[in-house]
């Protein structure tokens, strides 16, 4: 969902801390500095819209390599820190607002090259939809959405999360098969389930690999922390 969402923050938005000022000054070009600072201001003003993402993208494209690497790193830290505050402010907001903010952060993290945080946002959006789907059928998550997310997680080096998504995809496929047990589509469901099982098994094999287990544990912990945070929704 890509709605333009702006809600009132419970904090004081106009105060800029020294870390943000330092980030702004790291940009050597005044136009780039203005764009970067403008993006920070818009996030603090809770303007989670296409314009904010466009400003972020333009500021990153215009940077030289040295500025890009340093400013991108600082923006990642800023967005991670700000997300914790913002998610605490979402209690009481509509489901559309919550999902839209998660989508905004997922896309912003993707632009910043932080795929771990990007996938965390998408994972929580899928979980939130699934959690609320019994009372709001339109929020239901299809097996294809879970499968697509599992593939993306594998491709970006997070097989532990891919395994969890695969399990959710299999549960969704099982429900589909119970709804239409004799339909012509049932064979397609069985084929899809077999592909997902292979994906799940591959993810499990990689997750248990000793060489990368620390990375996967850290990733899992980050998702778990984010998940506990969003249960207050």
From Swiss-Prot:
Listed GO biological process terms: meiotic cell cycle; meiotic DNA double-strand break formation
Tissue: Specifically expressed in buds.
InterPro entries: DFO
Recorded phenotype for the gene knockout or disruption: Reduced fertility upon self-pollination, producing polyads with an abnormal number of microspores during pollen formation. Meiocytes are defective in homologous chromosome synapsis and segregation. Homologous recombination is severely affected during meiotic prophase I.
Signal peptide residue numbers: none
Known partners and oligomeric status: Interacts with PRD1; this interaction facilitates a binding to PRD3.
Name of the protein in its database record: Protein DOUBLE-STRAND BREAK FORMATION
Gene encoding the protein: DFO
């Amino acid at each position: 969902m890509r709605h333009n969402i702006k809600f009132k923050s419970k904090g004081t938005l106009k105060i800029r801390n020294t870390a943000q000022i330092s980030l702004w000054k790291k940009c050597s070009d005044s136009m780039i500095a203005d764009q970067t600072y403008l993006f920070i201001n818009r996030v603090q003003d809770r303007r989670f819209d296409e314009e904010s993402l466009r400003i972020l993208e333009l500021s990153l494209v215009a940077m030289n390599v040295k500025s890009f690497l340093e400013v991108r790193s600082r923006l990642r830290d800023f967005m991670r820190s700000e997300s914790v505050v913002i998610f605490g402010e979402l209690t009481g907001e509509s489901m559309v607002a919550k999902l839209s903010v998660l989508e905004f952060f997922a896309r912003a993290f993707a632009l910043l090259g932080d795929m771990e945080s990007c996938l965390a946002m998408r994972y929580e959006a899928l979980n939130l939809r699934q959690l609320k789907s019994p009372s709001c059928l339109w929020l239901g998550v299809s097996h294809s959405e879970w499968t697509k997310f599992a593939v993306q997680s594998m491709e970006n080096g997070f097989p532990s999360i891919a395994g969890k998504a695969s399990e959710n995809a299999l549960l969704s496929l099982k429900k589909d098969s119970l709804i239409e047990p004799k339909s012509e589509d049932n064979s397609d469901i069985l084929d899809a389930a077999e592909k997902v099982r292979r994906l799940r098994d591959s993810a499990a094999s990689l997750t248990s690999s000793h060489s990368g287990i620390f990375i996967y544990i850290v990733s899992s912990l980050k998702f778990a922390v984010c998940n506990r945070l969003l249960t207050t929704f």
